[in-house]
Regions:
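Short, structured segments at the rim of ligand-binding sites
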Residues: 1-190
Length: 190
């Protein structure tokens, strides 16, 4: 067994290497308001997966937290979260697997509930990316319908930069292999 004994943090400034992962930043953002002196975060390097950090800030604002983000500096003062209802939106990266099923089928049609076009998730680029794999998306009021299109993708060489949505790399890598496509993936270092 492991025993971890915490202590009260005394400093309110921290530097985060933005080139590794946005998860460290999101964690610090969420604890910032409960720290006695708040938190000032300086991001070193280019922030990968920035949409995930932006989603964290939007969620914090929903619960009453004021966040100041200017260039590579984020400040969160000591504040209280205000509990209130929140509907968690479905996961676009999970939807990518269903898009892959449709891309590999000739006449598949799948309805996915509650996915929204104007999502905060960086992975919400799935509909645009999957056009290249022969999948079209119809946005409905309460979700989406995805269908195989007649687009012939066998003659395409694709270049995809995953820097803002690295969680999609796994499903698209397998799909590209299954379709025997030539694709160059970048931005998956983290």
């Amino acid at each position: 067994p492991i025993r971890i004994k915490g202590k009260q943090l005394t400093k309110n400034e921290v530097e985060v290497d933005g080139t590794i992962s946005s998860q460290f930043l999101s964690t610090l953002l969420m604890i910032g308001p409960v720290l006695e002196n708040g938190l000032r975060i300086t991001i070193k390097g280019n922030l990968v997966s920035k949409p995930y950090a932006e989603m964290t800030v939007a969620l914090m604002k929903h619960f009453g937290i004021s966040v100041s983000w200017k260039e590579n500096t984020i400040e969160v003062a000591h504040q209280k979260y205000i509990p209130q209802p929140y509907k968690v939106e479905p996961d676009w990266s999970a939807a990518a697997f269903w898009y892959s099923v449709v891309a590999l089928s000739k006449d598949a049609e799948i309805t996915l509930s509650d996915l929204q076009k104007n999502s905060l998730q960086g992975d919400s680029v799935v509909p645009e990316l999957m056009k290249q794999f022969g999948v079209e998306t119809e946005f409905l009021k309460d979700g989406i319908i995805i269908r195989h299109s007649a687009f012939n993708i066998k003659h395409s060489t694709l270049n995809i930069d995953f820097i803002d949505f690295p969680d999609l790399a796994q499903s698209l890598t397998v799909l590209a292999a299954a379709l025997d496509l030539k694709i160059q993936f970048t931005g998956i270092e983290n």
